[in-house]
Amino acid sequence: MPAFSATVNFTDYSRAYLRYTETLRYPSIFEGIYGFSTAAGSFNRMGYGWRPEHAKNWEVGYIHDLTGLLPKMKKADFRINYFHNKTKNVIDRDSNLEFEQFDRQIRSGAELSTRFDTGRVFGSLNVFRSLKNKMCDETFQWSTVTAGDVDATYFAETGKTMSRPVCNHGGLSDSGYLASALQPRWSIDAELGSRFLANRLETGVRLHYHSRVYENRNDAWQPNYNIFNQYRGTNHKPQYNDMRWQPVAVWDAYLRYKIGKNLTAELVGSNLTNRYYLDPMSRSYMPAPGRTIRIGITGKF
């Protein structure tokens, strides 16, 4: 598959890059056979045989080494980048629990990564902003929810056809896996630590924060469902059981002591505030572990 990259060095400390790659992913065994919770149904849709997913990925970024301005720093740099990925023939489940291949999935986002290290104090900050995550299909929209009699009645009264969204945020089907595989709009990871006793003792704290998913398929499909409910006297909603998570900040801390050249002891506390939450992109409603304390010794031989 084609791939290329280009880098421009502005100075000894700064550069920009452009990267393009293409990849193929063939259907897995789980996606290509009949079994529990799945059925290989792509041949039911005319023109859709099994084909590999074909991704075209663009990334552009800027990297700057700050040690030229801060010579006493051992490390000090940042990177900012933007990516845009388009995948054709995306595999996902439909409302009949059958795997189908849909036209395309488009994902884009921006990232900022920065770090510093003075020798005594060190830290890092990583920020991710999800800009777009949608799946599109020109024909699947007509195989969902609205019955033909409603279409005919609406056309007879208005002279218009009922429009359905071609693209949906996340996935096209409530029963699909991609509908819950949505990255939060914001994700932030930060770390701050320090070293003592001739670097034999290291301690630090870590923060992980993610926001909620702000977009869903309700906004795109609600006008269509309003018409359907009006003609059928029902109260159907576009979104039934999609998983959603709330924003959460999780704090961890650790203490690491180098006993000898090949022996290290560590004390780690995870989720110190004992938050009850779901990890983003969870496949189930199993919550993340609560407050956890771990003690360990690692030896190298």
Predicted regions and their residues:
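Signature of Gram-negative outer-membrane beta-barrel scaffolds
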Residues: M1-S14, N126-L131
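Outer-membrane beta-barrel strand-turn architecture
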Residues: V8-D12, H54, H64-K72, K86, ...
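Transmembrane beta-barrel architecture of outer-membrane proteins
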Residues: M1-P2, Y20-L24, P52-W58, H64, ...
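Surface-exposed extracellular loop regions of Gram-negative outer-membrane beta-barrel proteins
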Residues: V8, D12-E59, F78, Y82-F102, ...
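Residues on the lipid-exposed face of transmembrane beta-strands in outer-membrane beta-barrel proteins
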Residues: F4-V8, V60-H64, A110-T118, I188-S194, ...
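Gram-negative outer-membrane beta-barrel transporters
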Residues: L70-T87, E100-D219
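C-terminal beta-signal and adjacent terminal beta-strands/loops
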Residues: L24-R25, H208-R232, W245-V248, Y254-F301
